[in-house]
Amino acid sequence: MSKGKVLVVGSNATRIEIQGGGTGPTGQYLNETVVPAMAVIDAGYEVVLATPNGKQPYIDPASDHAAHFGGDEKAYRRARDYFDKDPSMTNVRTLRAIVDEALDQYAAVFVPGGQGPVVDLMQDAELGKILRYFHERKKITALLCHGPIATLATLPDAKGYRAALIAGDKAKVAELGKGWQYAGYKMTVFTASEEIPIEEQFLHGKIYFTMPDALGAAGGEVSRSAVDFEPYVVEDRELITGQNPRSDHPIAAKLIAALDRATVAA
């Protein structure tokens, strides 16, 4: 018998804007998606995957290899097979359908990274409704790597906030960032220095804003690991955030521990 349901929110983005015009390839990271999802299932919970358009997330090719699984080819193949074949990953819902149903059936929400959320999830109105619901009820909200940027979907004008970040309009960013429900929360996110090798090796250009700046401007208290790409997870009230791809196992452990505490309390 399942101990509860966890909503996993994926991105449908495949391209991200780069400075000077044009776009670069992006998507969702395989390990960031499947490592926590598989761990949650192994711990006795169900997983439901939802995206803006109801289609399976596009896996960023930069993540689609064994290097993100400690060089373990068998672990990578298990992860790939799970994503490609398991009903929890292939029976994808739309975010709107999730909102239209009973949100109280979910014990937690989890948003993995890759740069995809920077394109669609951070300005998705339906995700904003979901995250506001979870925040108001102090329900577990976990986000990994670029995933924490999706919390900005809860702003009254999330699209305008993103546009102001791209335009570099600091005054507008400050104005539209007021009243964010996570202001004052301790959190982490993919760092500006960690972004550089991604920009150089895969995007061949710079994105318009950094993740720490975007969260910090709205009032997030952003911290980071002492060394780039070292695992780092921050937990503050209902919010659990992980800094980078290597934080996949640690955030899974924190998420499961929080779920188990909530199950006992219930």
Tell what function each PLM region has:
Residues 144-148:
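Short, thiol/selenol-centered motifs that function as redox-active sites or metal-ligating centers
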Residues 1-137, 150-266:
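Extended, subdomain-level signal for the structured scaffold at the beginning of enzyme domains
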